[in-house]
Amino acid sequence: MVLIWLSPLILFLGLILSGRSALIAGTLGTICAALVAYVAGPSHPDAAAIIRHFAAGAWIGLPATLVIIAGLAFSLSLEKASDNADPSQPEHGALAEACLLRGPFLETSTGFGVGYVVAVSGARRLGVDKAPALALATFSQILVPWGALGIGTRISADIAGVSLAALIWRIAVVTALLGAVLLPLFWRLSRQAKLPPALADRLEWAGLIVLLMALLVAANLTLPLELAAIAALAPVMLLRFLRVKGFAGLDWALLARLAPYIALVVALALMRLVPAIHDRLEHPSFKPFADASAFAPLLSPALPLIIIALVVAIRRGGAKQAAALMKLTLQRAGRAALLTFLLVGMAWIMVGSGLAGGIGLSVSGVLGSWSAGIVPVAGALGGYLTGSNTGAGAVSMPLATALVPAGEARLAVIAAAVVAGSLLTAVSPVRVTMGQVLIKATTAETGQALRALWPWFALVVGLTTAIALAAAQLA
């Protein structure tokens, strides 16, 4: 029976492995989940209940979908500004800055692999060959749990039914541990790229990464999800900038390039941290499903993202440019938006119909507390195959709720799974193909990059699985 209950996930992952598009796999996986829930669901839901479960999942996916659309518009509006950034001299510090700071900053604020694109392009401008450039750009995805202002992490928390505030600092701790063990891999790949770090570079970047990870944990303990990673990155980026260019580099041209990002951070801070503004924007709020989160449209990060994107477009080319921007945004975002609805709907059907609970009881009866190790592996597999931490959450969160009892252990296991799924999106076929097309790399060069990244796979999956198992054993 457990294989029947698992069949929606098996079908979804199997279709992707066979080369089908994620949209087709998501559609068929959702249909399969509905049929299995109706025929063999432990809670015996009728058709109306299954439709309600899917609708509740789609409702959870709505805020994320709006951020996907608005974030893509924001990214597209700033493409030319990114292309006109000052070129850097070919040295290790410039490479590390592109891959470890600038790429993660753009990924957290916009998502969609924008940080990866910036990092791989930056590496190529420094004279790095195509294969090592693809491998090094992977490090721009180290903060994907906060990518696109954290929409994937928010969805995972909603599916699992856990407190977002309690989850995000645990995700930050797991990320900090991985940041420490992955930095030597970055140095190794840098040597292969012929931009090796000197001792001074190692000391500087070890210090900067330690500072970044400490700030990341602190920010996630005190700030909302949307602001935490940006707040951690900003002072580290400023410190690096001042060390390289000094205060003389803080000119009006730099301010003009950064203005959209500054406006975004200020808007998010006002919306989330100023009680008078937050309370005013909290209404209207909609909660059509008792077991799904409320949604306040005026508090959505999508609002400042789309407003800033339109302002930038209008300043460049008037209303015509703004209309062209929105047309292009909707063309590119449509598939991602639909896939988000399908994946969250499928996961919610599995949770609401009792499929996830039935799986948990069956597996736990055999493996006991060791079954917790399955969750980050499932997250990693979902992230790798879909290229999306929303997809990773849709695969792993139903298992987390089923296999791990509620409490501290479940939060730790979910944090490990979110990080595993997020960091495996960095080496997913979706992400790597994006870089391959951008820099016109051959299949052989792409394969060389992936072979160089085998420690990334091993460290991410190994450490997150160990954390999940330790949390379950100590509970």
Regions found by a protein language model. Give the residues of each.
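Hydrophobic mid-bilayer segments of alpha-helices in multi-pass membrane transport proteins
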Residues: 4-13, 20-42, 64-70, 209, ...
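Alpha-helical transmembrane segments of multi-pass membrane proteins
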Residues: 92-104, 129-146, 166-179, 370-384, ...
